[in-house]
Amino acid sequence: MKKAGNVGKKEYAVWIFVFAVFVFCLAWALAAPFDASPDESMRYQIVEFIAKHGSLPDGRDPEIRNANWGISYAFNPILPYMAGAVLVKIVQLFTASFRATVIAARMVNVLLGGGMAWFTWKIGELMFRRKEAGRFFAVLVCFLPGTCFLFSYINTDGLALFTTAWILYGWCRACKEGWSLSVCIQMGIAMGLCMLSYYNAYGYLLMSAVFFVGCMMKCQEQKWYWKQMMKKGCLMLGIVFLVAGWWFIRSGILYDGDFLGMKTSSIYAEKYAIDELKPSNRVLPVNMDMSVLDMMLWVPGSWQHNWLVTVLVYCS
């Protein structure tokens, strides 16, 4: 009876925490001026296009092309913008207020912030023996100003944070209970959604593969579970394809085999961007014939330190 009571208190605590994160992100989303955050107007154009036309935009469409950059965010995965368009259409049934539609589009990330809070709390429970340490970990991660900021405006970064938290939760579960069917299905869904977020989150997909393969080896006997590895690995890959494959197939068809859309985006930036923002005119390592080591030691503009020193200080 006492154990059941403790479990109930634990669940009660996690939902209080999720609600607190949700309210904080919502308050920030309600207070933030439109386009005060990075490229929010460009991102909102995608939401607006989907809500207006009821279809997904082509990244080359002049209607959504930014006059300065010469490109649009439609070249990249747009899942949060699709969800935002649904909420915008619902809000438009009641009001034509521009501010209301912006808040509706932001609500996708506010909800994702609450979802990340749940996964972070659960990760803390699995990683730390003392509940206080786990809760401190969750608070530290979810109330980091940068984290809350990303859940306050229209972007795909929020989905990246949500899915990477889900992936890390899957890793923790795999360590505790093995690669069960439930864990494999969750990992497949999480990785598929991660592919529909930002490309800079793909490192978690690579490390998930490394982690999974490592888990399939017996640590003491140094033998591989080949059959289980293939069976469960194919299951997860199949789920990833079902969740995310459609987007990359679509991009490949639209952009003549450019399934990531990055090459086409660069071509259009070079063609339509203002002179100082054209890829060929920007101060980039690739345009300066830098090696990887040169990039690490490079001190751009008015920065005080190079990349290597910055990373070392941050990690310390």
Regions found by a protein language model. Give the residues of each.
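Transmembrane-helix motifs of polytopic, lipid-linked glycan transferases
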Residues: 103-128, 166
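Short acidic/glycine- and proline-prone juxtamembrane loop motifs at membrane-interface regions
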Residues: 146-159
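Perimembrane helix-loop-helix junctions
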Residues: 173-176, 204-241, 254
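Membrane-interface alpha helices of multi-pass inner-membrane proteins
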Residues: 183-199
